[in-house]
Amino acid sequence: MGLYATCLSNGPPVLRDATVDSTLVSELQERIEEKRETITVVPGEGNVLGVWGYLGDLYAFRNKTGNVTAGMYKATSSGWTEIDLGLALNFDGTTGNGEMVIGSLLTGAGGAQGTVAGLTYYGNWDVGAEGTVVLSDVTGTFVTDETLSTPTISFDAGTVEILQGDTITGSTSGKTAVVKIITIASGGWATDDAAGYLSITGNTGTWTDGESILVYGAARADVDGATEPSSKTLAYAYGTQYAQTLQPGGKYDFVNFNFEGEEGIQTMYGANGIDNSFEFDGTNFTKIRTGITSADTPSYVEAYKNHLFLGYTNGSLISSSLQLPTIMSTTMGSTELIVGEGVTGLNVESKDSLAVFARNTTYILYGKSRDDWNLTTFYTGSGAVDGTVQKIHTTIFLDDRGLTSLGSTLNYGDFKQSIISEKVDPLIQKYKARIKTALRVREKNQYRLYFDDKTGIAMTFINGKNEGIMPFTMLDQIICACSTEDSNGDEVLYGGFDDGYVRRLDSGTSYDGGSVAAFVRLAYFHYGTPQLKKRFREILLELTADTSTTLNIYPDFNYGDGTVPTSTAYDITVTDDEWNVDDVSNSSLGIAVVDKARARIQGVGENMGILIKNTSIYDKPVTLQGAVIQYSDRGLKR
């Protein structure tokens, strides 16, 4: 330790030793501040409303200037870049001629055209659905009430079912296409007379009337028409095309999930309580319409059993169609469940179940689809404070009784609750109505709550057991936070703050350039003789440290009851240790693994406690391994 690599403008990197190069540390600190000055706020005004990681990139949401709409932004090397939410067109009056599919060309009766980039609807398409189509590469302007058409392939004489995702080939023409949706207009596969329409993408040309439609070389049906695929009316425009926007405000909840079953394909889903939920694939943004007429503004989103679940403050719990997160069609698996209370959290549990939290009740949803969904009341009188549900080894949430763990029992499908914050209950009760956000930290096995006065608590688990709760104070007010992964798959923590910045948590050595004040108070101890007075002479701290720093030591005697004079503060200089990861494999270390720092003290008492403090901007953390106290007995207390 103590060696840093620095890049010189006139040559390759060289090693410089901080122990002999007096300017290295100051130069390093200058570089840190130079980089800090390049960090910018998320554009707009007010709080950062949400922050989330998706496919190695970082996204944030904040109200735009004027608070009329909110914006979605992506972190780049040059700062925050606004995401274009795209053009959309509402539609109704769907027909039985096939469905719109992603990647197909949509044409309006007036000549406007655009490529379907996103699609959401509610109801059953063949009998009249309503929804929204997101369009890219638009030419012209779509207008209200005009017909909307897309090329589909008409077929008849269907004998073997054609499936979504099949690549079809014409037996005579040799043309190919990928099937996205199959619409049956008459007959059936079982009776060898299925007829209808194939909604396709990637078509390579005009097919021949009557030729066989092949899948893996086997005939499945025949082409019905001489100019297939032909443009057919699928729906009617309901209003003109418009630029999508986000409502201002809200509190965002997110989940990433792969509904397509292909490796590496995940999509971001979000909800904010004041607007439609949404889907984002890195390029295209689609607001999800469910058909709720009062307020289609879910607060929570979760993926479970290949359905997207949306939780509402009015007590509704809506699931999407199977593997179709933006489609709310009952014939394809969508349904609405009634919770009866406002949903305050959703979390997938380990035993094929979804935990649904309300403020005063906990529910468990079992099943795999709308055919067997079973929403059961798990606990009446115990629910989750809004926004506090997080999953570590078990699900942790804040209830009126305190921090609560929802863990599975040995019996399949059963759960148990246990309060895990009894020892700090006064603190929990003080802040339970002042929660800003909660965060899980997987690498440290921690659950954190952030309060509205720049303070919070961190609960650490070891082998599934709560080993302690530590309060902390921050220099800035956090509003939202997330635990995500970078492009290497490593966990990173981000917080969105009230000043518009997104800051990486548990990173660096300062509060964004501000000093970090840290302390630890060791318990008072009588060293086996509570009635015997002692003269305390020395404190020897066993430490590990990555950088040199100074610790302030404050010994305190007799529980601080004032019967003895207040002790003097002592300073201890800590030097960085020489241990590093390469030494793990050494058969003979030859270096000190733990550093020792001592302070000569003076004080008399029956017991002593120790307060250790440090304030720094650039010093790295110091780990206290132990403390050895030297003292001599003085006699019994009279």
Residue ranges of each PLM-predicted region?
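Structural hallmark of WD40 beta-propellers
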Residues: 266, 352-353, 491
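Beta-propeller and closely related beta-pinwheel folds
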Residues: 39-47, 84-87, 241-247, 284-439, ...
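Extracellular/lumenal ectodomain signal focusing on beta-strand-rich modules
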Residues: 144-147, 209-212, 287, 477, ...
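Beta-sheet repeat architectures centered on beta-propellers
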Residues: 1-86, 246-263, 380-394, 401, ...
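Recurrent small/Gly-Pro-centered beta-turn motifs in extracellular repeat architectures
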Residues: 62-64, 272, 312, 358, ...
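Acidic/polar residues in short coil/turn loops that connect beta-strands
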Residues: 76, 110, 173, 238, ...
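Hydrophobic or amphipathic alpha-helical targeting/insertion segments
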Residues: 258-288
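Autoprocessing Asn-cyclization modules and mimics
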Residues: 73, 79-241
